[in-house]
């Protein structure tokens, strides 16, 4: 029973302070702008500086002090030309500030947890590339993978429930419900398939969705650590967090007192691995196909009956790792069977031994990468480089530096690719797009401008890694082939940037 105390104890870091009063503080909205995931709504109105934005916040706080003035009408933006086309501007400002406020209990809890456990701060583990060495070591020994799309059609009230355990301020929770029900039509478009990862969604909804996912993972991983074969009789322990600990404690009391072990078969599966990325997660295991089907329908019931989310079985795909590719963090990864023939001779007999072993490969999905280059106006839909007319007003050195920065950042991130051919194609597109942009600026042909730049211009597009490796190793066929097929993982990459952000 002692091993479950960490799950049964109530976290003493829960905060009971009133958070609602922080909505009347100007610095909260300044934090919302500086710490926001997206660009703040305060600065989306063209022609207004920080001083004008501060005036908006002061007017908002003054209005909130007045009774019955928190309910905003859509006519406010029409009657007042100061706000332009932004309807419900006040409500969006409050939602940004409120997103910062509700994160306070979670931030304090995280700091308290790190101090209590005295966890070492490892910057290497923060790198996005740190997950790939783990996949290389583990996935080659597994057989099946569940590719699951997390359901996002969630009732608005379900998003509030996980917060009730951490936020004890009833006024803040009521205000949150007010935002969700009063402005959901203006913030979420019901006619489209909306995911909570799109750029247009407010930060508050991103926080609510992430808190909901954390709630699901907390319960799911707890049960996964205790059991891999869960019977239907164990479904009684799935309840919302506010009653979760009481139910778990009662469950284990029944478990130990009544010898419930013959009904619930608990054991740990050391080969079960869980990875989540954006709106999907992977559950890989060494189990059989029948056992993975049990996990599939178990997850469907888990989401439908305990999180009230409609989960279709078709959103879960069971695949063999040797026949399946994972689209993960900008890579397409797979564990392929590689055969190697070994010739062995004993006396006069000659034997051919065929050894088959799994090898984890990561390649760059060239089609999706060219699609990103097309959206950023570096090439057309067929991958043919084009010029960027928006850069013709810049100096030549500035244009070259921008293209070099994009090329080196892409090469640095995709250095883990097992095959570099796709990466070289991307470099070619960026290099020729840079030349066409310069030629368009000076009103010359591409051939004439390439002769003017010379071969030194082409050498600038080599990454630092390629330059260093070319100096260390001799230019032999075997070495170049090994560098071409090898992959390198870096432990200094903490974010994925869009091509437009590289500029």
From Swiss-Prot:
Its main location: plastid. It holds the Pfam family Intron_maturas2. HAMAP family: MatK. It is found in: Plastid, Chloroplast. The gene is matK. GO terms for biological process: mRNA processing; RNA splicing; tRNA processing. GO terms for molecular function: RNA binding. One of its GO terms (cellular component) is chloroplast. Belongs to the intron maturase 2 family. MatK subfamily. It comes from Actinodium cunninghamii (Albany daisy). Keywords: Chloroplast, mRNA processing, Plastid, RNA-binding, tRNA processing. This is Maturase K. Usually encoded in the trnK tRNA gene intron. Probably assists in splicing its own and other chloroplast group II introns.
